[in-house]
């Protein structure tokens, strides 16, 4: 089964993503694109790919160990972008801002815990974003990218309270994501700053 660890988005953010996608589809209807289902959009921390069932426990254990170092923190969802560039857009995304550096620290800690458990480490730098569409053909892609980049997507605060391990299953209706395990970050109102907090501030500049 395919497994990944991610952060769930609140309904108000999903609603804004839905509005943005519907606007793009309405204004640029003739572009071949695979649009993300809003209910499936998460902020991915680590994608494992296909794993055996007996490896699930190790993934959950790594996530549990990771969150011990962190209190709940805030990020922002906002801004628009494309990969690789507007003139040859292949992916449309909504940005994720990490003002405290805690998101980068959380992802890095999870990556290290998973590596210690025997899973390959991701070599590419972590660039948090929410994919809303993949463009299948170049025809019309530049026009869609220009429209996407021209729409203002004001920052929306999101409180990160937990890390969730999901499994992904393919069906005739597309991918279905099911939570395997939930891993709560501590409540900062009830506990002192933890090791992840101070470390995240110290090296946030490298994110």
Pin down the residues of each PLM region:
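Histidine-dependent nucleotide/RNA phosphoesterase domain, centered on the 2H-phosphoesterase fold
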Residues: 1-190, 195, 199, 205-207
